[in-house]
């Protein structure tokens, strides 16, 4: 699995990045990361941001772009992604005004197909990122499965957050095995033991990484993106995750 790409979702270090995006990118590169995924740009001009990526040896694997941005400023979104050299645009969550039920999943799937069509026409790939809510029941399936079934595989891919799937009681490895070719990206963080199931650096928790990473490899996943929502020490935890992830992917 040595050809897999570890990356850092910059949301993990968001407070540092809000104060000093460019300096934080340099620190991320100094840990050994070679790719990042953005969740906002820290108010920095995108040309300058791209120059910094090039200078420190990082590439933007993608960026999280809320679905409403496509409705209000889609052309600008595409221009931003191209400037940064992103491969993927990722919808990070459903719109706030869509109910998380089966009809809502159909509505989201329709939006995703539309965004995916715009991205494909612009030479980009489009994916959807989950949390736990997408694994609520929808008939005999889950909302995530409904979105998977109702989206065009030529237009829409998925960024499966392994932690949130497992948090919801879903076997994430089995999900990957059921959907080969649809999940090019995964988000990785670990889960603490106990009822709180707090997130932890990769390798410092209870998730079955050998099983998960082999399932991801079988599914054709190439991007392994560290994202810790509530890191105790964001830089230290990001470095720990990278060290452990690199060892696991060898």
Question: Regions from the language model: what does each represent?
Answer:
Residues 48-52, 76-77, 171-178:
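A short acidic, amphipathic alpha-helical/loop segment
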Residues 33, 58, 124, 221:
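Short phosphate-binding/catalytic loops that engage adenosine nucleotides
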Residues 7-19, 63-71, 98-104, 201:
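Active-site mouth loops of central-metabolism enzymes
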Residues 7-11, 37-39, 61-66, 90-92, ...:
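A cross-family glycoside hydrolase active-site/sugar-binding cleft signature
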Residues 26, 35, 42, 67-158, ...:
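Active-site acidic/histidine proton-transfer and metal-coordination neighborhood
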Residues 37-54:
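Glycine-rich, proline-tolerant flexible connector loops at the mouths of alpha/beta enzymes
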Residues 51-59, 65-66:
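Active-site surface patch of divalent metal-dependent phosphodiester/phosphate bond hydrolases
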Residues 1-30, 82-85, 141-160, 164-250:
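Histidine-acidic metal/acid-base catalytic patches
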């Amino acid at each position: 699995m040595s050809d897999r790409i570890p990356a850092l979702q910059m949301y993990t270090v968001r407070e540092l990045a809000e104060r000093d995006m460019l300096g934080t990118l340099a620190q991320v590169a100094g840990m050994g990361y070679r790719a990042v995924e953005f969740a906002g740009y820290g108010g920095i001009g995108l040309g300058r941001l791209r120059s910094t990526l090039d200078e420190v040896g990082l590439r933007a694997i993608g960026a999280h772009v809320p679905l409403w941005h496509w409705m209000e400023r889609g052309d600008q979104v595409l221009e931003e992604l191209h400037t940064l050299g992103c491969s993927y645009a990722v919808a990070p969550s459903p719109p706030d005004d869509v109910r998380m039920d089966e009809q809502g999943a159909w509505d989201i799937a329709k939006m995703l197909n539309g965004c995916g069509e715009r991205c494909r026409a612009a030479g980009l790939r489009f994916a959807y990122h989950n949390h736990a809510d997408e694994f609520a029941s929808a008939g005999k399936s889950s909302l995530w499965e409904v979105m998977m079934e109702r989206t065009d595989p030529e237009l829409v891919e998925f960024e499966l957050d392994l932690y949130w799937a497992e948090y919801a009681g879903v076997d994430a490895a089995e999900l990957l095995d059921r959907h080969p070719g649809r999940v090019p990206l995964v988000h990785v963080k670990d889960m603490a033991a106990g009822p709180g199931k707090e997130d932890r650096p990769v390798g410092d928790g209870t998730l079955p990484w050998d099983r998960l990473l082999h399932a991801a490899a079988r599914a054709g996943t190439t991007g392994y993106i560290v994202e810790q929502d509530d890191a105790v020490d964001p830089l230290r935890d990001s470095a720990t995750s990278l060290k452990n992830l690199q060892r696991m992917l060898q």
